Regions:
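Gly/Ser/Thr/Ala-enriched C-terminal appendages of enzymes
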Residues: 53-198
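Hydrophobic alpha-helical positions that pack around
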Residues: 1-52, 56-99
């Protein structure tokens, strides 16, 4: 075998906070500062990868070894007044999958700025029907997650644990009213299954 190793990589610099979103020709493990145009500050979250499965990186950190994208999003940590920007506000600038805000009546061409704020803390995990519209497979994601949390191997197998990977549940974390880390739960379930069936 012969060949030439190249460490070159094309990286997409994305996100609403990036001053010049575009593709960069760079190399594996490059400094993120070279891709963020030196953007600094606590108000921006730098993600090595995409917003759903990427990892939080320092602005002076490095590109992940398997990543082909960096994302810059507003941190969303500033306090909001209850009536003007909090949960009692009319929410005319907020995106909602559950039609909690009247923005679902607006034209589909409206663009929203997504922030990293979860909008609350972890809550009880209940069946709400929010996962199914965004889940890419024809299985019952909520029941599968509940069986993983209960460590019920028979139920996990019947519900299709062997067909999924943690990344498949990434989009489920966005509309989740329970604010739980679904990908971590699925990863733990797969690890427990491997250990049990070893």
């Amino acid at each position: 075998t012969s060949g030439k190793y190249t460490a070159k990589r094309t990286v997409a610099a994305t996100g609403s906070e990036h001053p010049a979103p575009r593709y960069y020709q760079t190399h594996i493990g490059c400094e993120l500062a070279s891709l963020t145009n030196g953007l600094q500050g606590d108000s921006v979250r730098v993600i090595s990868g995409n917003p759903l499965t990427g990892t939080h990186a320092a602005s002076d950190g490095y590109l992940g070894g398997l990543d082909h994208q960096i994302t810059l999003l507003p941190e969303g940590s500033e306090p909001k007044f209850l009536l003007t920007a909090g949960w009692l506000s009319p929410g005319l600038d907020k995106f909602s999958l559950s039609k909690s805000y009247p923005t679902w009546l607006l034209p589909k061409s409206k663009e929203f700025v997504m922030v990293t704020n979860t909008g609350g803390e972890e809550r009880a995990f209940v069946v709400t029907g929010q996962y199914e519209p965004v889940f890419p497979f024809d299985i019952y994601p909520v029941q599968l997650i509940k069986s993983i949390m209960a460590n019920d191997i028979d139920a996990m197998e019947k519900l299709g644990i062997y067909e999924v990977a943690p990344e498949d549940f990434a989009l489920c974390e966005y509309p989740c009213t329970s604010k739980i880390d679904v990908q971590d739960i699925v990863r733990d379930g797969l690890d427990n299954l491997k250990k049990e069936l070893g």
